Amino acid sequence: MAVSEIKAKFKLNPLTKVPNFHSRRDKDLPGLLPCQLQHKERKLSPSQMRAFQDAYNFFNKDKTGCIDLHGMMCTLAKLGMNLTKHDVHNELRCADIDQDGKVNFSDFLKVLTDKNRFLKAVVPEKGTCLDLAGNPGILLFEILSKLIETSALPKKAISEIVSYFRRKFQETTSGMVWSPDTTGYGKRRFKPDICTPPSSSTAAFANAARIAIMKEKDLFKFLDELKKCNPPSDSPYSKIPIFPLFPNVDGVVMGKPFKDIQKLEMLKRKEPLNFFENYFFHKKDWKTQEANIKPVDPTSGYTTDILTIDQMLKRKQNWTVADAAAIKPHVKRATETYNLGIALEHRKQMLNLWRKIRGDLIGIESKNESFYDTFSTYTWSWNVCQELLSPKDLKLYDAHVNRNALHNSVFSSSSDISECDTDTGRKRKRKGFKGFRQ
């Protein structure tokens, strides 16, 4: 179908009635204060006008400088957005505010600055479809959000537009009372849609703006619901680090059998450096793991596990599901070996840092050994999902270094004494020889 035929078929006729987005929304906002309903829109500043003009210039337009069906379809294609011609035609009719059959810059500006259309885009009404086709009147907001997301506009224009809509969202929703007793929007704050991903990038931006102005109590509720909705993941970034914190064994420990506390105290008296971590957590023996790491091939620079996988991939050209399942354990083992090697190298670096800052003296000078726990916490590694150096490791390292230093100092002092005695003996001999000659 030619472009001229499309224009003739979907000619934008003047509207006899402007689509009303106000009546239903105002009825469905029981918590909105009267002062908010009577809120007068602020005039756009010159910099904001230029920012919206930059956004309008991105659209393909006809010879008169207005957005038509063909220009809107081309703009959507540039942004990778798919919409039928019928839906685009309806969106253009909704955007024709002055009913002149065209969407000019004035219409464009009135749509994007309208409070009710903005709410319809960022907070879809209950019972409406979440896609563009089932929720007409928000296409310009979605395109504007896409322009910001892809950085298709100048940096200054993006900053002005984002600041404008952030303030608009705060002003519009500041008077909403989100009580659970109200109907409609009052029930929407967390529970119904918390597990539903945002229907669009504009809604995602609105959610981010809403989180930024939440009170602490509401934020904790939001995070609790979010945790319930997220399925468990094998990613190391989804795991909570186990910090080396000591329990308060002097007070009452709820939910712990008394015999466990007695066992804990017994282990504490028996092995003061080894009781807590080995009792509560299955810590990895770094020396054993370091000995089990396979050496890197000097020619290729890779371990034998990775080279084995490489050979398996080269031998087979057509892979089946069974072949992929067979190679999966090899890949897992090679990945674990690689992560372990990285962790061990980082562990050596952290030990060198501890030696340079003289961490053992910090606890002695401050008369507090908590610095061992603090330093251990900051050696956490996601490669092995635990801290690379426990307080016990640091104390054993200090004992080893101090023992060697003491041995060296004793050896050096004894050698200095012998040298001093030798020099004294030589001086006495020379003095006696001079006296004999006299």
UniProtKB/Swiss-Prot annotation:
InterPro entries: EF-hand-dom_pair, EF_Hand_1_Ca_BS, EF_hand_dom. The modification Phosphotyrosine is found at residue 279. The keyword Repeat applies. Ca(2+) binds at residues 96, 98, 100, 102, 107. Pfam families: EF-hand_8 (PF13833). Residues 413-438 are annotated as: Disordered. This is EF-hand calcium-binding domain-containing protein 3. It comes from Bos taurus. The gene is EFCAB3.
